[in-house]
Design a protein with these regions (language model features):
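Short, small-residue-biased leader/transition segments that mark boundaries at the very start
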Residues: 1-5
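Active-site alpha-helical segments that house and flank conserved acidic catalytic motifs
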Residues: 7-32, 47, 51, 121-135
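Intrinsically disordered, low-complexity segments enriched in polar/charged small residues
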Residues: 26-28, 68, 109
């Protein structure tokens, strides 16, 4: 395989990996269709894209409260529930979905630039599956 082809495939993998991670982040705020409980990333003190967006959108007082809650009260179910509500209210989920769709689109566009072969349709299905999965 040529270097250009390898770079293109690598770029596709990177973009679909980002879309996959964002989809995983979204599960933390959704209904329990999957085995992952709600708020687990918050409990593990992980800053996900929806949460980062919310931290940028809220006022300084709320930002400090969220950060303090994650650092010091990450096992408090009522605080976790409030953080999830704030993420939803500020548009954090919509922002993350928009970004996930962007990386999905770029991955598909880059894949379509590659020559047709027996793997291309399978890769297209995999790329689409990443954002459609419910687990």
């Amino acid at each position: 395989l040529g270097d250009v082809y390898k770079r293109q495939v690598s770029k596709i993998g990177e973009n679909i990996g980002i879309a996959f991670q964002i989809k995983d982040d979204l599960f933390d705020y959704g209904k329990r269709k999957i085995g992952k409980p709600r708020g687990i990333d918050i409990k593990e003190k992980k800053l996900t894209l929806p949460l980062i967006y919310t931290l940028n959108e809220v006022d300084n007082r709320k930002r400090k409260w969220i950060i303090n809650s994650i650092k010091n009260h990450n096992r408090d179910k009522s605080r976790i529930k409030e953080i999830i509500s704030l993420v939803k209210e500020t548009g954090g989920l919509e922002y993350a979905i928009e970004k996930m769709n962007y990386f999905h689109k770029i991955a598909l566009e880059d894949l379509n630039k590659l020559p047709d072969n027996e793997f291309k349709s399978s890769l297209t299905e995999m790329i689409n599956y990443v954002i459609q999965r419910d687990f």
